UniProtKB/Swiss-Prot annotation:
Record-listed Mg(2+) binding positions: 26
Region (G1): 19-26
Annotated source species: Bordetella pertussis (strain Tohama I / ATCC BAA-589 / NCTC 13251)
Name of the protein in question: Elongation factor Tu
Family: Belongs to the TRAFAC class translation factor GTPase superfamily. Classic translation factor GTPase family. EF-Tu/EF-1A subfamily.
Gene: tuf1
């Protein structure tokens, strides 16, 4: 029975469970929804409902993901849980489910395992900013020293991948006990401690409208007597009539002024994140702007050609390549609205990449693109997507 109606007034935060197979991610997800729905309202979701993750497509890649929501006293959370390891890899690289923070589930009985490490590394590569740890199955460990040892191992592993291991909140508990209604320290109490850690350790994310203005250029028109109009959807920030903006990417950066904002054929004083607008630019010729560039607040973003990336290569079944590729492979990289050719440099220990693999690589583009760490892109060959990636580190 719902306790009162669901209010959307609380700040919204996106989280998800990560960790090794069978360490209890899905059980924990079910336990969180159950305990919090009893306390703050919302819908309890059983293990089976979450485990039967529906298939969805992100950038042509098939991913199984379960979405649940729950709330605490101060926030509303959207939470993703994936059934299989491959789904996590795809989810994190495509950004299908952006996470403001992740709950790393580690079985106290087993300690960190290969996928524990891999999910922490992926979180670092794709820019998940915060990790909280739930040491699950703590009821199965009688030895307090052993628990401490596992906790130390997890902290060391986090620090190794540049997360603040020493300051990371670690909650010990048993998702299974909590799900079964146990009110004890390892049951319901542990879930409430975890909820409190989420509320306090993960800051409220900046809303898109509060960021620095950025709009990918989709189309450019010349309107006689008025000048050049650039259309697109504002990704973040606000642009006001009369403000100076930069055109960034592909060619050298130039400054111009926004002399008008138009939406649905009406003139506005400003456009903001989420709006599909036409922006009138002063003294800019039609041939000065092209699809693939961005309009941005001056100094807020720079064009780059060289970067490292974390990439997932589509399997043959997903419509990807049927054969591996090797060092020096030159596909197109699709950033925001356009393709740019680039050359791939593989790590020394990687001779080739097979369809269905995920890999770290260095990329050199033929033309610079307005770029920052965390930017998503697709890898294409002749117009079809063969991979998805995220910029891990900018080189130049």
């Amino acid at each position: 029975m719902a306790k009162g109606k669901f209010e959307r007034t609380k700040p919204h935060v996106n989280v998800g469970t990560i960790g090794h197979v069978d360490h209890g991610k899905t059980t924990l997800t079910a336990a969180i929804t159950t305990v919090l729905s009893n306390k703050f309202g919302g819908e309890a979701r059983g293990y089976d409902q979450i485990d039967a993750a529906p298939e969805e497509k992100a950038r042509g890649i098939t991913i199984n993901t379960s979405h649940v929501e729950y709330e605490t006293e101060t926030r509303h959370y959207a939470h993703v849980d994936c059934p299989g390891h491959a789904d996590y890899v795809k989810n994190m690289i495509t950004g299908a489910a952006q996470m403001d923070g992740a709950i790393l589930v580690v079985s106290a009985a087993d300690g960190p395992m290969p996928q524990t490490r891999e999910h922490i590394l992926l979180s670092r590569q794709v820019g998940v900013p915060y990790i909280i740890v739930f040491l699950n199955k703590a009821d199965m460990v009688d030895d307090a020293e052993l628990l401490e040892l596992v906790e130390m191992e997890v902290r060391e592993l986090l620090s190794k991948y540049d997360f603040p291991g020493d300051d990371t909140p670690i909650v010990k508990g048993s998702a299974k006990l909590a799900l079964e209604g146990d009110k004890g320290e390892l049951g319901e109490q542990a879930i409430l401690s975890l909820a409190q850690a989420l509320d306090t350790y993960i800051p409220t994310p900046e809303r898109a409208v509060d960021g620095a203005f950025l709009m990918p250029v989709e189309d450019v028109f010349s309107i006689s007597g008025r000048g050049t109009v650039v259309t697109g959807r504002i990704e973040r920030g606000v642009v006001k009539v009369g403000e100076e903006i930069e055109i960034v990417g592909i060619k050298p950066t130039v400054k111009t002024t926004c002399t008008g904002v138009e939406m649905f054929r009406k003139l506005l004083d400003q456009g903001q994140a989420g709006d599909n607008v036409g922006i009138l630019l002063r003294g800019t010729k039609r041939e000065d702007v092209e699809r693939g560039q961005v309009l941005a607040k001056p100094g807020s973003i720079n064009p780059h050609t060289d970067f490292t990336a974390e990439v997932y290569i589509l399997s043959k079944e997903e419509g990807g390549r049927h054969t591996p590729f090797f060092n020096g492979y030159r596909p197109q990289f699709y950033f925001r609205t356009t393709d740019v050719t680039g050359t791939i440099d593989l790590p020394a220990d990687k001779e080739m990449v097979l369809p269905g693999d995920n890999v770290s690589m260095t990329v050199k583009l033929l033309a610079p693109i307005a770029m920052e760490e965390g930017l998503r892109f697709a890898i294409r060959e002749g117009g079809r997507t063969v991979g998805a990636g995220v910029v891990a580190k900018i080189i130049k």
